[in-house]
Design a protein with these regions (language model features):
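N-terminal leader regions that mediate targeting or early regulatory function
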Residues: 1-90, 110, 117, 125
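Alpha-helical bundle/repeat cores within regulatory domains of eukaryotic proteins
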Residues: 85-147
């Protein structure tokens, strides 16, 4: 899989899905599929949850994606797509939920590949979602804050 091609809508992931395919997932598909989040929000370290082996394995690859405006715009679009899922489905606002790990990944990816501002905006939007009824544990809140 070539990350830059995938993130610019020119390639497919390791399962043959395009970014558009993933953006068209139903809420049920988002909840039940656990391998897409590492693909649409890549990091420079392997996932501790899903072991497909795909990550940004060189600083050159990180720079290449970071300097590709189309790729970074699509990462931002993916973050908006994911936050809309979180707005529609509030069960993740609990003591522990796997979507909280996904939130951490999104923040880390935005910080790595887009900007601190984009990461901070996503983080602040998450805090707004839980503002009136926060059930998320303090450890997770600290992960988000420090991501």
């Amino acid at each position: 899989m070539i990350y830059e091609e995938f993130l610019t809508l020119k390639g497919k992931d390791f399962k043959g899905r395009t970014l558009d395919d993933i953006w068209s997932f139903s809420d049920k598909e988002i909840e039940e599929n656990h391998d897409f989040i590492q693909i649409i929000f890549p990091l420079n370290k392997p996932s501790q949850s899903v072991f497909h082996g795909y990550y940004l394995d060189s600083q050159d690859l990180v720079k290449q994606i970071k300097n590709n405006k189309e790729a970074t715009n699509n990462i931002i679009k993916s973050s908006k797509w994911f936050i809309s899922f979180l707005e529609r489905n509030t069960y993740w606002n609990s003591y522990h939920d796997h979507n909280q790990l996904r939130i951490t990944r999104v923040i880390e990816c935005l910080r790595l590949l887009v900007s601190d501002e984009a990461a901070d905006n996503f983080y602040n939007n998450i805090l707004k979602l839980i503002k009136d009824n926060n059930e998320v544990n303090m450890r997770t809140l600290n992960f988000w804050k420090n991501a």
